[in-house]
Amino acid sequence: MCGIIGFTGNLQAPGILVDGLQQLEYRGYDSAGIAVNNGSETKIVKTTGKVATLREKVEATADLAGTCGIGHTRWATHGGVTEVNAHPHVSGNVTLIHNGIIENYKELAASLKTKGFTAISETDTEVAAMLIDSLYDGDPFAALKEADKALEGAYGFCVMFKDH
């Protein structure tokens, strides 16, 4: 089962997110990642394997700073165990992590492709990020409500919008 953590505050997010993911290791996982927003851009670090490997990559990533972020440990349900399939996933203004299964993700991916969205992963999570991004007009809550109407399955999201 996946582990999800989010943080916003006055402290730097990267260490807090990785520490939180370490606390969720007992849940089992095959990959891990974090996204951190510094107010102007979102940076992502992800890896297959253990949170300890993620921590090493985070510590080696220059300019990874920000007080808002999300983190995820993944247990693969769609797509193989690869860094590309690890969460978080980004589409435009939307950075998303997810637990659950989106049953109609293939149909949504096909529809989104006609609108110019192309997935690079094999995950239902990236399709959800693309869907939310396609519906986003500056109001995060409206985009999420509309996306929820289109999504079929059981799921939970943690989402960051680049401009909020």
Show which residues each predicted segment covers:
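Conserved short alpha-helical segments that host acidic/polar catalytic motifs at enzyme active sites
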Residues: M1-H164
